[in-house]
From Swiss-Prot:
It is found in: Cytoplasm. HAMAP family: HslU (MF_00249). It comes from Bacillus cereus (strain 03BB102). The keyword Cytoplasm applies. ATPase subunit of a proteasome-like degradation complex; this subunit has chaperone activity. The binding of ATP and its subsequent hydrolysis by HslU are essential for unfolding of protein substrates subsequently hydrolyzed by HslV. HslU recognizes the N-terminal part of its protein substrates and unfolds these before they are guided to HslV for hydrolysis. A double ring-shaped homohexamer of HslV is capped on each side by a ring-shaped HslU homohexamer. The assembly of the HslU/HslV complex is dependent on binding of ATP. ATP binds at residues 19, 61-66, 277, 341, 413. Belongs to the ClpX chaperone family. HslU subfamily. Its main location: cytoplasm. Disulfide bonds: none annotated. GO terms for biological process: protein unfolding; proteolysis involved in protein catabolic process. GO terms for cellular component: HslUV protease complex. This is ATP-dependent protease ATPase subunit HslU. Pfam families: AAA (PF00004), AAA_2 (PF07724), ClpB_D2-small (PF10431).
């Protein structure tokens, strides 16, 4: 966990990936820092302080989800994104709202398990190598000493058998030591070995996921695990690949799942972040049965956000200290259309602004994972160096902004569509091009995009 970041440091980290939206960054930075502050309080006071949930308001593609996702990744907190429209009111067929908490715990278990695997990696690899040695130099089958009843009485061939076994053991030990040295030196990496691996089987209960049956809070497959032994199958792999498979199996054996579960539930309860997208779609005044159902979903979400206990296969999970971040465009509705009780549970309101041409320019070049850097890296694998002139980047940004204005505003996602269209021919012919360096100019951008961008009807379908 990295809860020690100051709010300013958190904003600086988010700036590496997200352009603008200072208010949203400040809100999540303060929320994260308050978790650190809360952890330093006396226990009686700590229990009284719950996180202040955040409501983000802004059009699609401006960074609502990315702010929350990067925030969670920054501190290593369990994080899930759910869509409010996927849930149904209790009594209807569909996912119940408690499933979001169960999904959060599953994510937390996966994170903790991965951390534990890293800790036991060296020991697991050592044991995997030992298994490889035994596979490469197998033990001979011991002769049974009970073939002849007379031998049991008089010890007929027992001494000679023991002598033979002893000699074989010495020879095998020498061979294994030799193989062990070769393995350590990496001389046997391409050797093919036959190993037994646990077969991954899909459960028939997977069909029940998403139908409301998961509300029982348990995994049927786990419950029946003791009655349904795991199947194994033989696989022929190179020593290099077999080592990975065996290391993973040994790591799973070395991990204490009780410890994993305990830590995972703690992290989900104290550090978990649930991002509820499209919350505006379940807001609205009651006018028909559909709206009544939407209000029912809001009322079902309310106790989860307020703080309650949710049954999971890992035990009961308290939601009192989970941070909820809700988001929506609110084009057809207003935050005040949410039921008053739910409004009160999201005291921090943040409005994200629409992206300007200047924002698009920055998005294209400034973040660590900037789009232009991605395309340059992809084409570099074909031996082609491409560069974009400043004027070309400005032209791309202007076209993206204009298409957003003329059609649906999908924010920064428009850049993905435009960049794909711009470099479509280049990407197709890259493996056949003999030029080592190509410069993208405003004229090239104009040639590829301007005609489409100016034709509103065409741009609706292509850009």
């Amino acid at each position: 966990m990295h809860l020690h970041f100051t709010p300013r440091q958190i904003v600086e980290k988010l700036d590496q990936y997200i352009i603008g939206q200072k208010d949203a960054k400040k809100a999540v930075a303060v929320a994260l820092r308050n978790r650190y502050r809360r952890s330093k309080l006396a226990e009686n006071l700590r229990d009284e302080i719950a996180p202040k949930n955040i409501l983000m308001i802004g059009p699609t593609g401006v960074g609502k989800t990315e702010v929350a996702r990067r925030m969670a990744k920054l501190v290593g907190a369990p994080f899930i994104k759910v869509e409010a429209t996927k849930f149904t009111e209790v009594g209807y067929v569909g996912r119940d709202v408690e499933s979001m908490v169960r999904d959060l715990v599953e994510t937390s278990v996966r994170i903790v398990k991965e951390e534990m695997v890293v800790k036991v990696q060296d020991k697991a690899e050592e044991q995997a190598n030992q298994r490889l040695v035994e596979i490469l130099v197998p033990s001979p089958e011991k002769q049974s000493g009970f073939k002849n009843p007379l031998e049991m009485l008089f010890g007929g061939a027992q001494n000679s058998n023991q002598t033979t076994d002893s000699q074989e053991d010495v020879e095998i030990e020498k061979k294994r030591q030799d193989v062990e040295r070769k393995l350590a030196a990496g001389l046997l990496e391409d050797e093919i070995v036959s190993i037994e691996v646990t077969e991954q089987q899909s459960s028939m209960f997977d069909m029940l996921q998403g139908t409301g049956m998961e509300q029982m809070g348990m995994n049927f497959q786990d419950a029946l695990g003791s009655f349904m032994p795991k199947k194994t199958k033989k696989r022929k792999l190179s020593v290099k690949e077999a080592r990975k498979v065996l290391t993973n199996e040994e790591a799973q054996r070395l991990i204490d799942m009780d410890e994993v579960t305990q830590e995972a539930v703690y992290r989900a309860e104290q550090l978990g972040i649930i991002f509820i997208d499209e919350i505006d779609k379940i807001a609205g005044k009651q006018s028909n049965s559909v709206d009544v159902s939407r209000e029912g979903v809001q009322r079902d979400i309310l106790p989860i956000v307020e703080g309650s206990n949710v049954a999971t296969k890992y035990g009961s999970v308290k939601t009192d200290y989970i941070l909820f971040v809700a988001a929506g465009a609110f084009h057809m509705s207003k935050p005040s259309d949410l039921i008053p009780e739910l409004q009160g549970r999201f005291p921090i309101r943040v409005e994200l602004t629409k992206l300007s041409t200047d924002d698009f320019v920055k998005i294209l070049i400034e973040p660590d994972n900037a789009l232009i850097k991605q395309y340059m890296a992809l084409l570099a694998t074909e031996g082609i160096e491409i560069e974009f002139s400043d004027e070309a980047i400005r032209k791309i940004a202007e076209i993206a902004y204009q298409v957003n204005q003329d059609t649906d505003n999908i924010g920064a996602r428009r850049l993905h569509t435009i960049m794909e269209k711009l470099l479509e021919d280049l990407s197709f012919e890259a493996s056949e091009i003999t030029l080592e360096k190509i410069t993208i100019t405003p004229q090239y951008v104009e040639e590829k995009l301007a005609t489409i961008a100016k034709n509103k009807d065409v741009s609706q379908f292509i850009l």
